From Swiss-Prot:
Catalytic activity annotation: tRNA(Arg) + L-arginine + ATP = L-arginyl-tRNA(Arg) + AMP + diphosphate
Subcellular location: Cytoplasm
Protein name according to UniProt: Arginine--tRNA ligase
HAMAP family: Arg_tRNA_synth
């Protein structure tokens, strides 16, 4: 709908330019936003205020000319001027109802991509191996997964790349520690965190041990069979731990998506050679660097992008450049999204620019750093255990499930006291599992990607506010309508007719699902989908309260309201699925 309004405004601008009202050569960015108060229309634009000065007119006078010039359209009932010169657009109720009937009949809810389908590489999760995933890996994993799901829903070909840290100094450290232990020490690897901490302690305390670790890194890089065998074993155990976390979280990541740093080892020397051939490298204290004038330090000197250390070793930038080339040459990506901590923003700005200058990626290939903020504890500091240690992600999820189970068990007892049929233990465990995992994920996804946020079990498990339990309950409320009806959502007849204010408000929100999904795909911001679903659930609650469904006054009204309820249920479920959340029929 927003695209339609933009096109209509552009046609009006073209007409006013042709008749001399507007000067030639104006190319405004036409903004169309949702109104906060639907009594003032469904959409609004400030285009008249933007162009009043170049037109030499008062904003309201230009707005009046625009209203006259905007062509009639079946989707619009009227256009009005508000305040200093806003244009308010009112949807046609008959067209709106018909569009919702079409959406209900469509398995994709009438959602289509705004633009051609693309091949999109999603770089997500990417934990360092040789130790277990911790809470710091949550955001990249679930935000990347949600955006990948949205892009797939819109018809893009999505290629997930789990760029795990499976190479580097930490492996020399672990190999050296394994040398010192009894033969059965390999069994300890099943608690990777304990093993890693012990090795790190030796590395920090013993210079001889640290030297041996570095020697083993060199042997590993040279292809020593024994080192490679143990390195492979470390990675297998690490990836097995990771997969358990992914399965527990319900994210679409598997072993087939793993493309670690080591996968690019054979290309690193060639990356340096190609940068040299392009004349981009400068030697600085023995290191090979690319200096970009666009990026300077506080003294005004260009910052280096180091691609080879003085000792010959390679860095993250070198591996990232090799990965970009692979993603162009082999994966044929049109767009690459990097879900990596916001603190790496400068790094990505630099390597993107180097990749383009070197010709590793074409100008038309989109490279986007989808940075995110930090998950903190209640004190606003990075989330830690009580003794200051790193919180394992699997432990966090287990606690979430345990807390959710206790919550739903208490509500189940209240259910029995009211004379309602209680859930059995198997059902309670499943409900607790879904509520627990969904709550952790939704609490994160509902925050703006670039913002830091404080982790709080009590808030995220609440049945009030913008939380997973609230939305899950909204889904079960819709499902209960059709259980009482004794009929499936797919068997509905009649058509949607919009009469009451609550029906119109709900319908207007449902109609915006397609625009919203396209916006999430464009910007990589799942919190917009969370906010949409929360508002949709609230509007359904108001509709449910004020517009009787099963006891409607006549069959046509009942059919219409059932269809609105069905479309709401499907939209909520589809939206939650795109966020990577499970839903429940009853809770």
């Amino acid at each position: 709908m927003k695209d339609t309004i933009r096109q209509l405004i552009q046609q009006a601008l073209d007409q006013l330019t042709a008749d001399g009202t507007l000067p030639a050569g104006l190319t405004p960015d036409i903004q169309v936003e949702n109104t906060k108060d639907r009594s003032h229309g469904d959409f609004a634009s400030n285009i008249a205020m933007m162009l009043a000065k170049p037109a030499g007119m008062k904003p309201r006078d230009l707005a009046a000319r625009l209203v006259e010039a905007i062509p009639a359209h079946e989707q619009l009932a009227k256009v009005e001027i508000a305040g200093p010169g806003f244009l308010n657009f009112f949807q046609d109720h008959v067209w709106l109802a018909a569009s919702l009937d079409r959406a209900l009949a469509d398995e994709r809810l009438g959602v289509r991509k705004a633009g051609p389908a693309q091949r999109v590489v999603i770089d997500l999760s990417s934990p360092n191996l040789a130790k277990e995933m911790h809470v710091g890996h949550l955001r990249s994993t679930i935000i990347g997964d949600a955006v990948a799901r949205v892009l797939e829903f819109l018809g893009d070909t999505v290629i997930r790349q789990n760029h795990v840290g499976d190479w580097g100094t930490q492996f020399g450290m672990l190999l050296a520690y394994l040398e010192e232990q009894p033969i059965d020490a390999e069994a300890e690897l099943h608690d990777l965190e304990v093993f890693y901490r012990a090795a790190k302690k030796r590395f920090d305390e013993s210079p001889e041990f640290a030297d041996r670790a570095r020697e083993l890194v060199v042997k590993l890089q040279a292809g020593d069979p024994d080192c490679l065998r143990l390195w492979t074993r470390f990675n297998e155990i690490s990836l097995s731990h990771c997969q358990k976390v992914y399965d527990r979280l319900g994210v679409k990541l598997s072993m087939a998506d793993v493309m670690g740093e080591s996968a690019y080892n054979d290309d690193l020397a060639q990356v340096v050679a190609d940068l040299t051939a392009k004349g981009l490298l400068t030697e600085d204290n023995g290191a090979l660097c690319v200096f970009l004038e666009e990026f300077k330090n506080a003294e005004g000197n260009p910052l280096p992008v180091i691609v080879q250390k003085a000792g010959g070793g390679y860095l993250y930038a070198t591996t990232d450049l090799a990965a970009m080339r692979y993603r162009h040459n082999v994966l044929h990506a049109d767009r690459v999204l990097y879900f990596v901590d916001q603190r790496q923003a400068l790094h990505f700005q630099q390597v993107f620019e180097v990749a383009r200058r070197a010709g590793f990626v074409p100008a038309g290939m989109e490279l986007e750093h989808m940075g995110f903020g930090t998950m903190n504890g209640a004190d606003g500091r990075p989330f830690k255990t009580r003794d200051g240690g790193t919180v394992k992600l699997i432990d966090l999820l287990e606690e979430a499930e345990s807390r959710a189970y206790a919550l739903v068990k208490e509500r189940n007892e209240q259910r029995a006291e009211r004379g309602e049929e209680p859930f059995d233990e198997v059902q309670l465990r499943e409900i607790g599992r879904v509520v627990g995992i969904d709550s952790v994920k939704y609490a994160d996804l509902s925050k703006h990607r670039t913002s830091d946020y404080s982790f709080n079990f009590e808030l995220m498990l609440s049945f009030e506010g913008n939380t997973a339990p609230y939305l899950l309950y909204a889904c079960t409320r819709v499902a209960s309508v059709f259980r009482k009806l004794g009929q499936g959502r797919e068997q509905l007849g009649g058509k949607i007719v919009l009469e009451q204010p609550q029906e119109l408000a709900l319908a207007a929100q449902l109609a915006q699902f397609g625009d919203l999904i396209n916006n999430v795909a464009l910007k990589g911001v799942p919190h917009l989908l969370c906010a949409y679903l929360y508002e949709l659930a609230g509007l359904f609650s108001s509709f449910y309260e004020h517009c009787p469904i099963l006891t409607a006054e006549d069959p046509a009204q009942k059919d219409s309201r059932l269809r609105l309820a069905a479309l709401t249920g499907r939209t909520l479920e589809q939206g939650l699925e795109l966020l990577g959340l499970k839903t429940l029929e009853r809770m």
